[in-house]
């Protein structure tokens, strides 16, 4: 009951106040009051000197800043800048513009701003800025009875943003907007964020195609120059790059091209046209991807994260092409050389056999034999007669490599038999060794090279990806 009575009493008290406000607003539009407002504005501007700041010679003027971010239009890695559109508001108190008799704020034409003192605010890292002028110049001037001036502008500025692209495109960037007084030092003017944490609005509504705004920070500080100390406000945006675009446009194509280059390991090694065409195509494709990426980035002296990945993919693709070059050399290079060497050895053996079969007879009727070394120990073929027979005769006459048969003792015949047995033993050992060599895999076999490549390339490329993503993501 008591609550209902309080509400009724409050309603009765507020009703006269509302009537008074309506009457004042209505009276301001009356011709007599319009002339009074005109006289008030004329009186404020009469004798006003825009060359002097408010309270000249006294304490510094406190200028409050508010920013309503409309959009971040572009972030350029090539130019190292970003474009920002905002509603920029400044407020300060100028006692020369205080008035009485009109309990209303006076919103004046934007051209009146040219007749009033305004702070010499500028953007320190600005490259190009302009105030919008459609349909009229987008600026506002509003006066309060206590002399407070509200000055608003709609500005689009392109500000420098120095980026560290070592982790590109897995990077985060900090882009700032530096607001500073150009001529007035801290003895004449002070800047502050009007509204504290609420001085900057509209950031949460912004959506960028390649970035996400993780956080923003407002800073107020003083900077020292040779001409004095100046006030500075900083608005810093923390931008995190979205990786989805680069996965679809760069990482995935590079990975697929690298895997495609391994198809040559399953193609027959004598299909030179197919394997060479595939290898060259993959190498040129990787080169095209790298070239296109470099065109969209500045020419910086350090290596970026995406450069390391593309370089790794290019190395794997190039090694796949070199692998076939090695296989081709083994199969088509050494093969004919070995075959030619084998034919030369065979012809030399046949020539030696013909020379061994030649029989010469001297004038006395003796058989002449040239001194030849035993070429084949496994054959055991020797010119032996009457082994163990003491009557067997072989005469020897050493002159110009001529041998005559002379009688051979039983001891010499026994030694010949032992030599023949040793030759047979050596032949068996060599045949056994050749059988063992067949069981050992030949490292120059082209099929084994392709088989090892089918396992080596995917495993090493997978390890490369694991190390790369663990390092740059974390």
Curated annotation (Swiss-Prot):
A molecular function (GO) term: ligand-gated monoatomic ion channel activity involved in regulation of presynaptic membrane potential
Major location (coarse): membrane
Residues noted as binding histamine in the record, renumbered to the chain: 122, 181-182, 227
Residue spans, topological domain Cytoplasmic: 328-451
Subcellular location: Postsynaptic cell membrane; Cell membrane
Activity regulation as described: Potentiated by histamine.
Pfam families: Neur_chan_LBD, Neur_chan_memb
Residue positions binding 4-aminobutanoate: 182, 227
Gene Ontology cellular component annotations, sorted alphabetically: chloride channel complex; GABA-A receptor complex; GABA-ergic synapse; plasma membrane; postsynaptic membrane; Schaffer collateral - CA1 synapse
Keyword Ion transport attached: yes
Catalytic reactions on record: chloride(in) = chloride(out)
Superkingdom of the source species: Eukaryota
Annotated S-S bridges: 161-175
Membrane-spanning parts: 246-267, 271-293, 305-327, 452-473
Glycosylation positions in this chain: 33, 105, 174
Signal peptide start and end residues: 1-25
Family: Belongs to the ligand-gated ion channel (TC 1.A.9) family. Gamma-aminobutyric acid receptor (TC 1.A.9.5) subfamily. GABRB1 sub-subfamily.
Role according to the record: Beta subunit of the heteropentameric ligand-gated chloride channel gated by gamma-aminobutyric acid (GABA), a major inhibitory neurotransmitter in the brain. GABA-gated chloride channels, also named GABA(A) receptors (GABAAR), consist of five subunits arranged around a central pore and contain GABA active binding site(s) located at the alpha and beta subunit interface(s). When activated by GABA, GABAARs selectively allow the flow of chloride anions across the cell membrane down their electrochemical gradient.
Domain notes: GABAARs subunits share a common topological structure: a peptide sequence made up of a long extracellular N-terminal, four transmembrane domains, intracellular or cytoplasmic domain located between the third and the fourth transmembrane domains.
Protein name: Gamma-aminobutyric acid receptor subunit beta-1
Organism annotation: Bos taurus (Bovine)
Upper lineage: Eukaryota, Metazoa, Chordata, Craniata, Vertebrata
């Amino acid at each position: 009951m008591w609550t209902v009575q309080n509400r009724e009493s409050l309603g009765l008290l507020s009703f006269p106040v509302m009537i008074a406000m309506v009457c004042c607003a209505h009276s301001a539009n009356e011709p007599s009051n319009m002339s009074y407002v005109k006289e008030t504005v004329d009186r404020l501007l009469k004798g006003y000197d825009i060359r002097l700041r408010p309270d000249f010679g006294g304490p510094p003027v406190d200028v409050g800043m508010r920013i309503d971010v409309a959009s971040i239009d572009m972030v350029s890695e090539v130019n190292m800048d970003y474009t920002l559109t905002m509603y920029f508001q400044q407020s300060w108190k100028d006692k020369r513009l205080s008035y009485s008799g009109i309990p209303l704020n006076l919103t004046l034409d934007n051209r009146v701003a040219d007749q009033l003192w305004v702070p010499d605010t500028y953007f320190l890292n600005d490259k190009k800025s302009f105030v919008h002028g459609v349909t009229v110049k987008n600026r506002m001037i509003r006066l309060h009875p206590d002399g407070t001036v509200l000055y608003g502008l709609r500005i689009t500025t392109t500000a420098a943003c120095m980026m560290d692209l070592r982790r590109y495109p897995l990077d985060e960037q900090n882009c700032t907007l530096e607001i500073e007084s150009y001529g007035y030092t801290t003895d004449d003017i002070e800047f502050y964020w009007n509204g504290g944490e609420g001085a900057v609005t509209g950031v949460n509504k912004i959506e960028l195609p390649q970035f996400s705004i993780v956080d923003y920070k407002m800073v107020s500080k003083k900077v020292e120059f040779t001409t004095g100390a100046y006030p500075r406000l900083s608005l810093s945006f923390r931008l995190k790059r979205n990786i989805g675009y680069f996965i679809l446009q760069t990482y995935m194509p590079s990975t697929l091209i690298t895997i495609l280059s391994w198809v040559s390991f399953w193609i027959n090694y004598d299909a030179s046209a197919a394997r060479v065409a595939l290898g060259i195509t993959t190498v040129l494709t990787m080169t095209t991807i790298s070239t296109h990426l470099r065109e969209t980035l500045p020419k910086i002296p350090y290596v970026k994260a995406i450069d390391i990945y593309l370089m790794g993919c290019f190395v794997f693709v190039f090694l796949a092409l070199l692998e076939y070059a090695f296989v081709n050399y083994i199969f088509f290079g050494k093969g004919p050389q070995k075959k030619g060497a084998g034919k030369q050895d065979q012809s030399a053996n046949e020539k030696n056999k013909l020379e061994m079969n030649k029989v010469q007879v001297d004038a006395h009727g003796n058989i002449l034999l040239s001194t030849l070394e035993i070429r084949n120990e496994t054959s055991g073929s020797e010119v032996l007669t009457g082994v163990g027979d003491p009557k067997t005769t072989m005469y020897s006459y050493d002159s110009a490599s001529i041998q005559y048969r002379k009688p051979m003792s039983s001891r010499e015949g026994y030694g010949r038999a032992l030599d023949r047995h040793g030759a047979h033993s050596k032949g068996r050992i060599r045949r056994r060794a050749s059988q063992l060599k067949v069981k050992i895999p030949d490292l120059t076999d082209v099929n084994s090279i392709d088989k090892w490549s089918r396992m080596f390339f995917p495993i090493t490329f997978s390890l490369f990806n694991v190390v790369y993503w663990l390092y740059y993501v974390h």
